[in-house]
Amino acid sequence: MKQLRWKYDYHSNPKEVNKHWHILCGHNKEECDTAGYDWADEMFDLFKTKFGFKDKYMVEDYVRIYCNAHTHGLEPHMHTDDGDFTMIYYPRLDWKSDAWGGGTLIDGQLVPYKGNRLVVFDAYLDHKAMPVSRECYELRNVVVFKCNVKDANHERLDFYKEN
């Protein structure tokens, strides 16, 4: 993940001003492969099989995969996501959560950043990345999988789009 070409100027909530580092991997296998992020599509397939996404969540595929990153001084905003489920993977095995912070606040509950952890939650829940300590000189990065339930009624998503 350290070798990726990050772009700054992305915000999780268009109504807010704070931005963070971001990479769009793709909306499907072909886009991920073409852009050089085949590993992201393979990661999703591994998680899908290992954790039984189809049986547990009725999820067969992703809508998009992207990577987000934060450094000290970036203050993330609370937001909700489009889609049915958001899945956040913490890849950094060397992350020192107690000293550096950088977890995720989901519906008022802090989920500490722990390397090789996959967090799955309803996309409509308020959430945000937590700030990174000024004692941290590392990039707090995550891989995010946005997913919809197969054949779901997505009427509730209109509420998100209007607000």
Describe each PLM feature range.
Residues 1-59, 163:
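Non-heme Fe(II)/2-oxoglutarate
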